[in-house]
Every structure is written in structure tokens, then in C-alpha cells.
């Protein structure tokens, strides 16, 4: 079991928190992490590319000239692909680039990135992040007290709306919950700021 220092909002030590080795103490599997990150980045692609084929291009309903007797090549529409302004053949159509990996693979990737952050001392545990109202300045003070000045992913428990609203407008700060934090977000962050309640939820889901 790994022990990490537990801080309060003012940056003072509030004890120790014991992390489950099954979630935060495994040997990171870089291959699985890579596969999951590629999958999540693929899902972020918009895939809205499109062109018009001959049925979608405006016009071209009338045969441009009669079939025989003109000496010209036969044509059925001025929107055929060989015409300037005609439809595109086999062009791109809107599609989703996303694909799903097995749940076991996704969970192993999450455990791997969490374990890596703990091993690199980039995991900051805080007893709670409680605010009486959404105040960005107050959250900035919390980060300063905890000496966090780089890219950070804040992982909260469900329902902590004021903390989420206080943090989301700060530069280099991203907010997630224990159940929505992604492998991509965790790997992209320099530090993790995790509440004690969120740690319990992460262990409940992944252990």
C-alpha cells in the first residue's frame, strides 16, 4: 500500500492517505496506455468532411443534347463526374472515427496512468475542495497554496459543482470527476489534484 500526504485547502498537511496497490501501485503497461490514447483521440475527431456526388450537385436534370446526330459524344447530364462542376466520385462522407476497446483494457490503462503519476510524485491528495460559491480567485489561491503552477487535472467527487465551476476558467486547469477522468487527460497533465472522496470512488470503480 502506498502512502501519500493528504493536504487541506490551505496547503497544510492533514495526515496520510493509503492508496490501493491494485489501482495506484501496478506496473504501468505502456502499450495498453498507447492503444487507449489513440482510441480516445480518434473519438475526438469530428469527421464532418463531405463532398457532393452527382445526385447532390444542383442542376443537371436535363440531357444536354440529343443522343444521336450531333457528332459529339453522348452525354446524359452536365453534372456527370467528367464535367467541370460535376459530382465527385467516391469522395469523403461524414463518418465517426471512434472505436471502443474492451473494458478490461480501458481499466488497465487507467490504473497504469494513475500508478505512474503516484510513482513520479505528481499525485496531490486533498481532503476536500469546498466552496460556498463559484469563485475562480479562491481556487487559484488553493493551487498556489499547494505549489501547483503547471498543467493540472482536478479530479472531484460527483456533485461538487462549486469547485468545478471555480476551477474551469483557470488556464492549464482541467476538471473531471472520478468516473469521467480519461487516460488522455491524465497522461496530458503534469499533476493530478484529487480529493479524498474521489480517491475512494476511483478505488471502488477500478479495484
Curated annotation (Swiss-Prot):
One of the primary rRNA binding proteins, this protein initially binds near the 5'-end of the 23S rRNA. It is important during the early stages of 50S assembly. It makes multiple contacts with different domains of the 23S rRNA in the assembled 50S subunit and ribosome. Forms part of the polypeptide exit tunnel. The lineage of its organism: Bacteria, Bacillati, Bacillota, Bacilli, Lactobacillales. Part of the 50S ribosomal subunit. GO terms for biological process: response to antibiotic; translation. GO terms for cellular component: ribonucleoprotein complex; ribosome. One of its GO terms (molecular function) is rRNA binding. It comes from the Bacteria. Keywords: Antibiotic resistance, Ribonucleoprotein, Ribosomal protein, RNA-binding, rRNA-binding. SUPFAM superfamilies: Ribosomal protein L4. This is Large ribosomal subunit protein uL4. It comes from Streptococcus pneumoniae serotype 4 (strain ATCC BAA-334 / TIGR4). Residues 49-78 are annotated as: Disordered. Belongs to the universal ribosomal protein uL4 family. Pfam families: Ribosomal_L4.
